[in-house]
């Protein structure tokens, strides 16, 4: 499997999974080198956990099982039929059809497949139905053998080699054959409801037809759940070998009345678009205030966003209209390219240009060709967007495919348009239906678990449960408004399903849980005019943009401490002013633990707004929560945003804790728990010496950039301002409005959440000194701001570190 590195524990195993998945308590194996096998009800099963790592479980039944894994190296759980004692080729067994009904929740590198071996010759095979954050088997050393359509699904046929690796016959060299769905049947960090059948014999026939050796004797056919350095769970409700699902012959897509075969405005998520190469695709803002997708993490220029085209609809030699709208906000100008990847009649991969356009920074452009002819003999069609001369992140909206001459889905205005941002703006209240009952997503008049499930179905399968879905009881506009109970005004997300469940178990007292800034009816309407603000105490500076100078006199002694820092920028893009008694864009982490070296559970009662400030505290543990991998002794406080933020200036007003073994922090973070690489930028004050601050950052999990700076004051005695200006080619750290350090190498590029926490350490005495158990300890924060336009301090550019 893909060799990904899991550096930071996931924030939490999703509440959705814990509520919906398990109906029985499985036997759990803690950090043992497990290989358990058995038979039940005529089925063979196996659970395997490599290298004595993590926490795993499998609970087998007759034609069913549940499993879970966390913190593992490599894990698999499988169940099926063993044919080895018969020593026959697959053709002797007639049509082998495996039918499955599975709830599959991958959180990282994982896949669900039909799996097995043959002997004489030795061969390992996979028929992959769905995966998490990585499509197997990757591209290194992999040969392509075209595509095949079986059971109404199109699969790529691939071959890889394993040299001197473990097998059913000991350490051997052997091939692996793969059928991989061109579109995954699952999504990462989501509970996927997967019910289908796999005509296994037809895959064997397709491999043989493609020239792969299928002369061996069949060893087994199993349904397999596998994970590599990831977390996840599965509820395999049934496996059978009798078919039982009537799969109609596939038919080509018919164009709608406007000529579109496919149209995706991304209002309900990423649709069928996925990351290509290392790129990640996430729902974000789009053109003209709508939703779109954000493409990030491009480690090579050909990485981007891609979609597989149905070959029954899009035929070689015929002409179509293909396109999308794109925008980048990070370089002065780049060329976008729409490309068709295909396999020709000789089995060779080709890349044909559909359209190329130039886009200035912040400018939406139309990347479409209304008359593109698919090359003769082309199969395995993949349409993708790339930036050939740059690795910049970019935005997309309005992707479509239609008959020749069909107009683009979005008509790009010639006037200047503000680029979309991942942080919240202050939109006016949208038009549309008003709420009839908070949480009633399925509009049945009540609020229960079925509403949370319905939201997850809507997000996971918009073709069935979307506003125009095929299911009779699909989502309605009224249901979307009712169900939008977390950050109301931001649209339906998994967080809304979680909020409903929190309401049902009385973790929160009412719905909605929160409003998107500007959507709370108790607030007055605010302007959305973008203003660049220079904050000083004495001067006003005017540039070519509208520039004002604002002096904010901070109320004294919030939380009992003086304010000796610079004033808050009242015109920043995002402002969370805890002095008002409100959390702004933040929420408290509650009921989970990171793992080492964080010797605490995060609880919301350790993160409170009181006495004109946010107070993050370390105290004794409040509950009897247990974790088999890591059982911290204390409780800690953490505040984090729901939204992701990118380049710009981040600043907070903070008073730190003073005690050996503790940390007060302000940072941005994203990682595997967000389906992203580990990127992080830190400001940390170590309680052992509060006259210093530590700066640090991680890029794709690589750190070792620590820098200690002498403050010249004790940060535990008063509020001071701490900030960093994050740009594509540098990070500059600030203290009280003055730049004090700058880094220019291997700068992070993935948007992250803004976070603050207070925590005690364990096993890191050489870094923090040993924690003596003193509680309570409290760090105080007055406000946090983010300014998309970067730093505005008058001392910008000073760098005493050279």
From Swiss-Prot:
| Amino acid composition bias (Low complexity), ranges on this chain | 419-436, 533-553
Using the UniProt record, name the top-level EC class of this enzyme in a single word: hydrolase
Residue span, GH16 domain = 556-792
The UniProt record lists the Dockerin domain at 434-513
> PROSITE patterns of this UniProt entry?
DOCKERIN (PS51766), GH11_1 (PS00776), GH11_2 (PS00777), GH11_3 (PS51761), GH16_1 (PS01034), GH16_2 (PS51762)
Key words, A-Z = Carbohydrate metabolism, Glycosidase, Hydrolase, Multifunctional enzyme, Polysaccharide degradation, Signal, Xylan degradation
The positions flagged as active site in the entry are 124, 226, 684
Q: Where is this region: Linker?
A: 524-555
| Example GO biological process | xylan catabolic process
Q: Where is this region: B?
A: 245-523
Q: Which Pfam families match?
A: CBM_4_9, Glyco_hydro_11, Glyco_hydro_16
Q: Which residues form the signal peptide?
A: 1-31
EC numbers, comma separated:
3.2.1.8, 3.2.1.73
Report residue spans for region: Disordered: 414-436, 533-564
- Classification via NCBIfam families: BGlucanaseBglS
Could you tell me what this protein does? Contains two catalytic domains with xylanase and endo-beta-1,3-1,4 glucanase activities.
| Family under the similarity heading | In the N-terminal section; belongs to the glycosyl hydrolase 11 (cellulase G) family.
Q: What is this protein called?
A: Xylanase/beta-glucanase
What is the species of this protein?
A: Ruminococcus flavefaciens
